[in-house]
């Protein structure tokens, strides 16, 4: 509300105020303004501040303050930086930010902080913005104002996301203290914990999230108001309100970026490229702070002009009213402090009140105590009372003053001072204040010093002068400089002034007058400066040395010479036409061309540009040296008689002429885009096209010169003109060189007298030598000094150029001021200069060539750089003839005539023979061209098995020359002892039978499979590589031996022994090559079932080994049994507890040993009982006499035993019925019965095939085979016909092309004859003669060419007829081919129909598909009966195909795994390379540190040396000033004296010795010493220069080492990044390996299942083959039919449905592996590049080390040389001092 009220008040005040025109033209004033005096009766508008408070307008404080706006982070500030736009991430739209100085005017690249002031570039619609560095979250923008301002609000518009966190702070004491305005954050609690989020008072600091959301992503705003509208402000000038508004510095701190989270998982730098701060516009609204005492503000700098003011800029200095002053009207004016200062508010102006000082003071101050004491009426105390008054109101006189009673209190003379001269009075200037006649005191009389007199003590006594206050005596004797005083007459006693010489001034005649120097004893006293008018800024020089103020790069005392490597440019600015920017041809007269000429001084550059009629030359001129008028001169050369009448020139200016610049007054003379006509006289070489056109320095102009017509009324198509250059000649008559002084007038008269101006326009004009100096003066002025030579280091001999004109010393054949181009007739600009063109005089048009390539301009049919070869298609230079290549090649060898790049499979000198692998007759006119050898296929197919072939001239057939191992007419079969299938794409290989066959025998191997058939030496196998069954050994060495196996220990179920070792197949626990031994701790080999374990008891047996035959273990005492685990013999029981005797009856027991566990004895037959002492069951009698009971007992005993067994079984069956029922009990019986019934049913259903059906099928199969054979024959015949037609067409094309070449040759010859007639007139005599001779030779050959052309025409007619016949024949063949194709399609359809019947036929032969195989013909495992399984729907076929797919999958997986392993190895190698590079870089860094330390030590040594030299220089004893100056000059190691300085030094030396007596003798005696000093000086200078160079080299080494250190750091970072990437890639590869392994396991399982299925099918096949053998022939014929059908159908074995999932998985794995491989490859490349860079850095360091060592040696050598020189220099210096002391004593 307050701000709105202020704006309304200001607007109303402006509407009611009218400025006075006179007053508005007055300069702005600060402080109090005098009231304007208006004429009577004029309507007066009051000032807006006169009756109320007033305020200046608000605005954007950024405008006009780009230099006060800074940012802590700006993208592209040091180098271009890439950034991406988030909204374009799908297309990866990225751009470059380049904020370097050279892109300052490119808003698309430059995003400096100043771009936020305006939304677009001023004057355009191009948007501008500031942008920070990528990923940098802490960024600061700061505005530093030049004064205190009132700040109202801030608006920031972002180009990207608004910051996630930021705060605004300001300072009102110019940055000494800072205060935060407000925090902004997306999450205030997280970003600024503890900061309140509610605003209660205007001074509260709060945090808001209103302007920190993610949306919008572009053009989001952040708005801040200092005084929130929701809080009412009652007193706007309260201290806390003013503190909130006032501001001198503003700072925006951005602390956090909005990110999308992708940087959390991937920390690569690429992810940071889309996160940055960007501000398109920022408005800092405010006004200058004036506290209501000003309505407008002015710039701080009074020199700030209106032209420099930027629209909308708010200035900081208030234009104060109400008698206030200050930057912000914060205090009263010096004389308006009677009331305290207050800000104006509303209608109260609170103006400052004037103090009352009786007109004796101009300023006063406010005193609060005085103000209070006066009752708050007046508090002003006068400051610095004038007129010698004092007091609050200046009502009293000051001490040492007296009051004049005759004057009014306000009179300026009311208090009269004592008026004592302070220089001549004493007692602090006290005078008598009153007239006291009695005491003799006079008011105002002063007390004087000793040599001073007068009432005021202001006069020296006679003989004294120079009244000084610090002189106790007051005055001193007169002292005049004898060198500058005329006749040394002294000074005037009253004034003390001396009488000076002509060019001397000063009270003591001790100063030279302006524009003079060098006070001396000469009659004039000083010498004139005589500064060069062009080389110096003015004619003022140094009063001692006479050195003038030189323009840039000018030197010498008078600034008349350019510095070394600089020159004085020529006055005309020449722009060569040979390098013109554009040449536009508007007619049909041709384009511009370069005409090179040998320089002769009549033109500039390397020649001319030939310009035809209706053409325009465009010159771009951007090197204007000074803004001034110029004459635009065109230098040219006419090519024919007559003036060029119609020509125009247009000057295109880049922009408007600066009205304040040097061309402001002359801008209207020649406006832009105006066509100025001119003509070019044929007898002149130059013309002024534009007269006195003013051009401005620093701008680029275009001069468009249009050569319309040579004759204004007619066209001249052949008219051309040679243009040399566009030359700009400055109008020297307007320069200050010829204006403004007497000397300038003299120079102008001399310039006109010698007609120097003509040499600027006419190159052939020979000017007077005196013009050269005047031209140099003008050129230095126009170019503001000298220009650098810039001699091209490649084309010049040195860097030094001529001082006038700047021409460098060029190498051979190099021209140009800078030696930067080749001379006409040369080319190949390089270190050795340029090479001569050497254009062939016969083959080239002239002697000039291309400056870069050296290509000469060749005449027709010639070729080569020097035009010394024939064109392609010709040979035998200079008599170029057409190449004879039988139509198979377009070019031939230019010297030999050998055809090059023969086509159509031909070769030879004239392409007259066929290439290897081809046969035929390639000669011109033959109908049989070179055809590929088909043995059995062409060489290109890779299926050729012959060394070549040839044409059988008897029948025009092909004869193949078969390679070893092939035979047949087309090498389509394998020779004896070779195998393969060469006719179907295979090859023949030598049978490998391991030298186990008779090589002289035939049929050693199968020609299809290569399996050996006649193995010898007891060998077997496909390659006789194995021993036969029952034999072993190395079959390759023919030493197979028969196996010898022990029949007891050999496993007879395994047929044979090992073929290689002879190891027999042993039974269990049997060992030995012959299987004749039991294994350790085993026995019983004689069992024939292997050996049993001894099982010796570990407690009762002594050893584990038992007897190998009986198995008896060796028992301990008290143990027995075979295994020693029982009691000893004839005892039983547990041996570990107690053994008891057997007690077997000796008559009834068969053995005295009883059962060792139970004690039961083994009885004889018929004997029983525990001890075998009674008759057994079934026997009767009295022991030991027992006999059997008989047959009856035995029969009943058997019956009872059977019934017992049956009863037991019945009980068990009953239990099963109770559990599972009756059927469960008889499951096996029911199953067997079911099988038998099903077998009978199958036999009844599967016997329905008759013999008639089989015969019918056989007939149809044979018919189909015959039809296919006939189709193959017709196809072969058609292919042969097509080949013949193609060859005929090729021959016809060759003949037609030859005819066309001859026709073009005739036309070219005719054209050349016509052109030669014209060229004879323009060329020299020798060239014309050569052309004439050449033309005569060609004319002589025309008759021959005519005959050849006639013959070719006849051949063409014949060929046309032949082509017509061939076309008819081709048409017939095409019809036959179409019929054949139709028949093939019919056969294919019929074959398809037959194929579709095959499953039904198989059903008829084999039974229903899917049934199990039976004894008759098979079933599900086959497609037809008998033989081997081959049907496509059988289980074995599916299994084989599935097995194949699994194996392919396994192969692919293996391949991918190998690729992954290879990638891992590559990554490992890359990591090793990176590690090696890191180690190298580390070693280089350590080595660079050592070099740095050594360099620092040497630098310190050099510094010590220089300190010693300086100390030596400073330690000088007192000597005459002349000797001291000479010694100082001698010790100055950086002596670079110009000739004038040397002369001055000589003059000083002469003056120094002028007062000496016997000067000649002194000079004679000291001459040797002086010579030695001079020599020492030159040696010291040379030593100093070498030391400086060494120091510079050392500094460069240090800088290079620093750069290497920085590069080392970058290399370390890059290596770390590479290691990180390698680790990531390794993790990816491990994942790929795991996934590959997981995919491999199912594939292996599938392979195992398929293998099992194959075994089952094989078993099934064996069962089928045992069945019906009568159907074997039928099966064979059906298999042949199916084979033919599958060939006709193509690829029918594809199992995409079964393997699609596997293929997709493998494809995914392959893709991921490929990605990983590419990533690894990139890492390897980066590591390799890093290695290369590191090696380069190491090489640079090694080179620097070499340089350092060399320089160090030089420094040591120089130190050794400097020591004796210093010693000798000291001796001579002592000698000079002694001589000087001697001469001084003589003088005194």
From Swiss-Prot:
Provide the residue span(s) of the region labelled Disordered.
23-43, 1690-1719
Key word Signal present: yes
Report keywords, A-Z: Basement membrane, Cell adhesion, Coiled coil, Disulfide bond, Extracellular matrix, Glycoprotein, Laminin EGF-like domain, Repeat, Secreted, Signal
Glycosylation-annotated residues? 138, 201, 232, 487, 591, 1051, 1246, 1301, 1330, 1341, 1473, 1493, 1515, 1581, 1644, 1703
Show where the Laminin IV type B domain sits.
567-783
* Span list, region Domain alpha: 1406-1432
Motif (Cell attachment site) positions are 641-643
Q: Which cysteines are joined by disulfide bonds?
A: 288-297, 290-318, 320-329, 332-352, 355-364, 357-382, 385-394, 397-415, 418-431, 420-446, 448-457, 460-475, 478-491, 480-498, 500-509, 512-526, 529-541, 531-548, 550-559, 789-801, 791-808, 810-819, 822-834, 837-849, 839-856, 858-867, 870-880, 883-892, 885-899, 902-911, 914-930, 933-949, 935-960, 962-971, 974-988, 991-1005, 993-1012, 1015-1024, 1027-1040, 1043-1057, 1045-1064, 1066-1075, 1078-1091, 1094-1106, 1096-1113, 1115-1124, 1127-1139, 1142-1154, 1144-1161, 1163-1172, 1175-1186
Q: Return the SMART domains for the record.
A: EGF (SM00181), EGF_Lam (SM00180), LamNT (SM00136)
Q: In which tissues is it expressed?
A: Found in the basement membranes (major component).
Polar residues: bias regions: 1693-1708
What GO MF terms are annotated?
A: extracellular matrix structural constituent
Compositional bias of type Basic and acidic residues: which residue ranges? 1709-1719
Q: List the effects observed when the gene is inactivated.
A: Results in strong reduction of Ndg accumulation at the basement membrane in the gut, muscles and ventral nerve cord. RNAi-mediated knockdown in the larvae reduces Ndg accumulation and created holes in the basal membrane of fat bodies.
Location of region: Domain II: 1189-1405
A Pfam family hit: EGF_LMN_ATRN
GO terms (BP aspect): animal organ development; basement membrane assembly; basement membrane organization; cardiac muscle cell development; cell adhesion mediated by integrin; cell migration; defense response to Gram-negative bacterium; embryonic heart tube morphogenesis
- What are the boundaries of the region Domain I? 1433-1788
InterPro entries from the UniProt entry: EGF-like_dom (IPR000742), Laminin/Netrin_ECM (IPR050440), Laminin_IV_B (IPR013015), Laminin_N (IPR008211), LE_dom (IPR002049), LMN_ATRN_NET-like_EGF (IPR056863)
The entry's cellular-component GO terms read: basement membrane; extracellular matrix; extracellular region; focal adhesion
Function, please? Binding to cells via a high affinity receptor, laminin is thought to mediate the attachment, migration and organization of cells into tissues during embryonic development by interacting with other extracellular matrix components. Required for Ndg localization to the basement membrane.
Domain description from the entry? Answer: The alpha-helical domains I and II are thought to interact with other laminin chains to form a coiled coil structure.
What is its quaternary makeup? Laminin is a complex glycoprotein, consisting of three different polypeptide chains (alpha, beta, gamma), which are bound to each other by disulfide bonds into a cross-shaped molecule comprising one long and three short arms with globules at each end.
Q: What is this protein called?
A: Laminin subunit beta-1
What organism is listed for this UniProt entry? Drosophila melanogaster (Fruit fly)
Identify the taxonomic lineage of the organism of origin. Answer: Eukaryota, Metazoa, Ecdysozoa, Arthropoda, Hexapoda
Gene designation: LanB1
């Amino acid at each position: 509300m307050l701000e709105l009220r202020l704006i309304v008040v200001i607007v109303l005040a402006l509407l009611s105020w009218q400025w006075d025109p006179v007053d508005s033209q007055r300069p702005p004033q600060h402080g109090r303004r005098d009231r304007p005096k208006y004429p009577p009766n004029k309507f007066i508008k009051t000032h807006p501040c006169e009756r109320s408070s007033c305020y200046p307008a608000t605005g954007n404080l950024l405008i006009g303050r780009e230099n006060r706006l800074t940012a802590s982070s700006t993208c592209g500030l040091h180098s271009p930086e890439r950034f991406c736009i988030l909204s374009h991430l799908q297309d990866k739209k990225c751009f470059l930010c380049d904020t370097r100085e050279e892109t300052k005017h490119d808003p698309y690249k430059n995003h400096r902080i100043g771009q936020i002031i305006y939304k677009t570039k001023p004057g355009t619609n191009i948007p501008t913005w500031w942008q920070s560095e990528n990923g940098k979250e802490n960024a600061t923008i700061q505005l530093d104002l030049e004064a205190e301002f009132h700040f109202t609000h801030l608006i920031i518009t972002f180009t990207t996301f608004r910051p996630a966190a930021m705060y605004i702070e300001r300072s009102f004491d110019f940055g000494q203290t800072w205060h935060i305005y407000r925090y902004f954050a997306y999450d205030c609690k997280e970003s600024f914990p503890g900061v309140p989020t509610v605003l209660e008072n205007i001074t509260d600091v709060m945090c808001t999230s209103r302007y920190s959301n993610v949306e919008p992503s572009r053009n989001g705003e952040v708005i801040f108001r200092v005084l929130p509208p929701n809080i009412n402000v009652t007193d706007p000038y309260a201290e806390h309100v003013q503190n909130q508004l006032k501001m001198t510095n503003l700072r925006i701190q951005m602390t956090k970026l909005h990110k999308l989270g992708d940087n959390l998982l991937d920390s690569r730098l690429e992810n940071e490229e889309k996160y940055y701060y960007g501000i398109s516009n920022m408005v800092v609204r405010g006004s200058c702070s004036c506290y209501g005492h000003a309505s407008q503000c002015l710039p701080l700098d009074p020199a700030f002009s209106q032209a420099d003011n930027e629209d909308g800029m708010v200035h900081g200095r208030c234009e104060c009213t109400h008698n206030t002053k200050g930057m912000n009207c914060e205090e009263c004016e010096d004389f308006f402090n009677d009331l305290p200062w207050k800000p104006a508010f509303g209608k109260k102006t609170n103006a400052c009140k004037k103090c009352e000082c009786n007109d004796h003071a101009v300023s006063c101050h406010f005193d609060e105590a005085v103000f209070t004491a006066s009752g708050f009426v007046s508090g002003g105390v006068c400051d610095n009372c004038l007129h010698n008054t004092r007091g609050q109101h200046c009502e009293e006189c000051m001490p040492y003053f007296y009051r004049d009673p005759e004057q009014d209190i306000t009179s300026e003379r009311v208090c009269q001072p004592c008026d004592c001269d302070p220089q001549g009075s004493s007692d602090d200037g006290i005078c008598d204040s009153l007239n006291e006649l009695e005491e003799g005191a006079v008011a105002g009389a002063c007390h004087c010093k000793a040599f001073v007199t007068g009432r005021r003590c202001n006069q020296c006594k006679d003989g004294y002068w120079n009244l000084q206050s610090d002189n106790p005596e007051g005055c001193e004797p007169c002292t005049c400089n004898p060198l500058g005083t005329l006749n040394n007459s002294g000074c005037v006693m009253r004034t003390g002034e001396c009488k000076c010489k002509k060019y001397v001034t000063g009270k003591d005649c001790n100063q030279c007058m302006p524009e003079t120097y060098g006070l001396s004893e000469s009659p004039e006293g000083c010498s004139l400066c005589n500064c060069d008018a062009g080389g110096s800024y003015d004619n003022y020089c140094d009063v001692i040395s006479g050195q003038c103020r030189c323009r840039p790069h000018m030197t010498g005392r008078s600034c008349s010479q350019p510095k070394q490597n600089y020159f004085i440019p020529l006055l005309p600015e020449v722009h060569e036409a040979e390098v013109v920017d554009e040449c536009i041809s508007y007619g049909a007269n041709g384009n511009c061309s370069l005409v090179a000429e040998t320089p002769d001084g009549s033109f500039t550059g390397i020649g001319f540009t030939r310009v035809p009629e209706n053409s325009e030359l465009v010159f771009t001129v951007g090197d204007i040296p000074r803004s001034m008028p110029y004459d635009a001169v065109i230098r040219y050369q006419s090519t024919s008689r007559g003036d060029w009448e119609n020509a125009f020139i247009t000057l295109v200016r880049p922009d408007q002429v600066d009205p304040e610049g040097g061309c402001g007054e002359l801008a209207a003379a020649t406006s832009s885009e105006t066509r100025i006509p001119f003509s070019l006289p044929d007898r002149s070489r130059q013309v002024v096209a534009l007269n006195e056109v003013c051009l401005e320095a620093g701008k680029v102009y275009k001069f468009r010169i249009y050569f319309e017509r040579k004759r204004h009324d007619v066209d001249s198509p052949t008219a051309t003109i040679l243009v040399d250059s566009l030359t700009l000649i400055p109008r020297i008559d307007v320069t200050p060189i010829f204006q403004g002084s007497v000397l300038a007038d003299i120079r102008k008269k001399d310039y006109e007298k010698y007609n120097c101006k003509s040499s600027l326009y006419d190159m052939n004009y020979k000017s007077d030598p005196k013009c050269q100096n005047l031209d140099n003066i003008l050129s230095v002025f126009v170019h503001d000094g000298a220009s650098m030579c810039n001699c091209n280091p490649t084309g010049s001999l040195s860097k030094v150029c001529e001082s006038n004109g700047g021409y460098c010393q060029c190498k051979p054949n190099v021209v140009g001021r800078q030696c930067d181009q080749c001379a006409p007739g040369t080319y190949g600009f390089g270190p050795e200069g340029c090479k001569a063109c050497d254009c062939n005089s016969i083959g080239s048009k002239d002697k000039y060539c291309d400056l870069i390539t050296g290509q000469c301009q060749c005449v027709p049919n010639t070729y080569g750089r020097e035009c010394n070869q024939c064109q392609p298609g010709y040979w035998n230079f200079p008599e170029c003839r057409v190449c004879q290549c039988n139509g198979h090649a377009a070019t031939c060898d230019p010297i030999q005539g050998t055809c090059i790049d023969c086509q159509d499979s031909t070769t030879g000198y004239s392409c007259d023979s066929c290439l290897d692998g081809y046969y035929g007759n390639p000669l011109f006119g033959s109908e049989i061209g070179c055809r590929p050898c088909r043995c059995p296929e062409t060489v290109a197919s890779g299926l050729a098995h012959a060394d070549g072939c040839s044409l059988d001239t008897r029948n025009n057939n092909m004869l193949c020359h078969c390679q070893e191992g092939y035979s047949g007419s087309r090498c389509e079969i394998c020779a004896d002892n070779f195998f393969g299938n060469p006719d179907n794409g295979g090859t023949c290989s030598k049978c490998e039978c391991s030298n186990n066959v008779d090589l002289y025998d035939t049929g050693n191997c199968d020609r299809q499979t290569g399996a050996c058939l006649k193995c010898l030496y007891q060998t077997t196998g496909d390659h006789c590589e194995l021993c036969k069954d029952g034999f072993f050994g190395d079959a390759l060495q023919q030493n197979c031996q028969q196996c010898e196996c022990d029949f007891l220990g050999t496993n007879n179920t395994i047929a044979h022994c090992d073929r290689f070792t002879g190891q027999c197949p042993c039974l269990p626990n049997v060992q030995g090559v012959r299987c004749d031994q039991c294994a350790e701790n085993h026995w019983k080999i004689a069992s024939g079932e292997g050996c049993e374990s001894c099982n010796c008891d570990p407690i009762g047996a002594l050893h584990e080994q038992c007897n190998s035959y009986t198995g008896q273990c060796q028992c301990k005492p008290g143990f027995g049994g075979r295994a020693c685990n029982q009691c000893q013999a004839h005892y039983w029981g547990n041996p570990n507890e107690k053994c008891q005797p057997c007690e077997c009856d000796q008559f009834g027991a068969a053995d005295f040993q009883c059962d060792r566990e139970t004690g039961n004895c083994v009885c004889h037959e018929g004997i029983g009982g525990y001890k075998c002492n009674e008759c057994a069951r079934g026997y009767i009698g009295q022991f030991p006499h027992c006999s059997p009971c008989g047959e009856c007992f035995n029969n009943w005993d058997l019956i009872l035993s059977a019934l017992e067994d049956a009863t037991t079984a019945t009980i068990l069956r009953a239990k099963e019925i109770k559990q599972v029922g009756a059927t469960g009990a008889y499951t096996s019986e029911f199953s067997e019965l079911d099988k038998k019934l099903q077998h009978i049913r199958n036999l009844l259903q599967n016997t329905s095939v008759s013999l008639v059906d089989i015969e019918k099928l056989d007939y149809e199969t044979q018919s189909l085979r015959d039809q296919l054979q006939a189709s193959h024959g017709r196809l072969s015949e058609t292919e042969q016909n097509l080949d013949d037609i193609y060859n005929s067409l090729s021959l016809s094309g060759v003949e037609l092309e030859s005819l066309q070449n001859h026709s073009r040759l005739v036309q070219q010859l005719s054209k050349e004859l016509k052109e030669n007639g014209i060229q004879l007139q323009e060329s020299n005599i020798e060239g014309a003669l050569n052309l004439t001779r050449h033309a005569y030779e060609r004319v002589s050959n025309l008759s021959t060419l005519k005959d050849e052309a006639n013959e070719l025409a006849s051949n063409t007619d014949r060929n046309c007829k032949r082509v017509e016949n061939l076309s008819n024949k081709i048409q017939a063949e095409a019809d036959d081919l179409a019929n054949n194709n139709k028949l093939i399609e019919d056969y294919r359809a019929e074959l398809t129909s037959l194929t579709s019947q095959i499953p039904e036929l198989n059903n008829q032969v084999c039974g229903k598909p899917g049934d199990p195989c039976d004894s008759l013909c098979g079933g599900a495992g086959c497609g037809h009966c008998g033989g081997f399984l081959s049907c496509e729907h059988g289980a074995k076929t599916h299994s084989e195909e599935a097995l194949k797919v699994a194996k392919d999958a396994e192969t692919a997986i293996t391949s991918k795994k190998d690729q992954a392993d290879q990638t891992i190895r590559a990554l490992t190698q890359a990591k090793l390379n990176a590690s090696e590079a890191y180690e190298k870089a580390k070693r280089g860094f350590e080595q660079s540190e050592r070099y740095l330390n050594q360099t620092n030590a040497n630098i310190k040594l050099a510094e010590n040396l220089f300190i010693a030299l300086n100390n030596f220089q400073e330690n000088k004893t007192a000597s005459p000033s002349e000797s001291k100056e000479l010694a100082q000059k001698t010790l100055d190691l950086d002596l670079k004296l110009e000739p004038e300085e040397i002369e001055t030094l000589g003059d000083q030396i002469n003056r120094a010795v002028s007062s000496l007596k016997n000067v000649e003798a002194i000079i004679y005696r000291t001459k040797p010493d002086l010579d030695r000093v001079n020599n020492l000086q030159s040696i010291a200078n040379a030593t100093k220069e070498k030391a400086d160079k060494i120091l510079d080299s050392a500094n460069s080494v240090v800088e290079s080492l620093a750069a290497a250190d920085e590069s080392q750091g970058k290399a370390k970072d890059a290596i770390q990044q590479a290691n990180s990437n390698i680790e990531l890639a390794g993790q990816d590869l491990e994942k790929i390996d795991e996934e590959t392994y997981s995919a491999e396991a199912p594939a292996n399982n599938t392979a195992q299942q398929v293998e099992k299925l194959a075994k089952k099918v094989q078993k099934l096949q064996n069962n089928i083959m045992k069945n019906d053998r009568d159907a074997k022939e039928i099966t064979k014929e059906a298999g042949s039919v199916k084979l033919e059908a599958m060939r006709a159908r193509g690829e029918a074995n594809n199992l995409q449905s079964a393997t699609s999932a596997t293929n997709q998985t493998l494809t995914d794995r392959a893709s991921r592996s490929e990605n990983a491989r590419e990533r690894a490859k990139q890492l390897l490349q980066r590591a390799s590049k890093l290695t290369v860079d590191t090696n380069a850095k190491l090489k640079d360091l090694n080179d620097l080390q070499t340089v350092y060592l060399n320089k160090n040696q030089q420094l040591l050598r120089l130190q050794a040389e400097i020591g004796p020189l210093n010693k000798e220099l000291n001796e001579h210096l002592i000698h000079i001092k002694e001589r000087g002391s001697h001469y001084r004593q003589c003088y005194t």
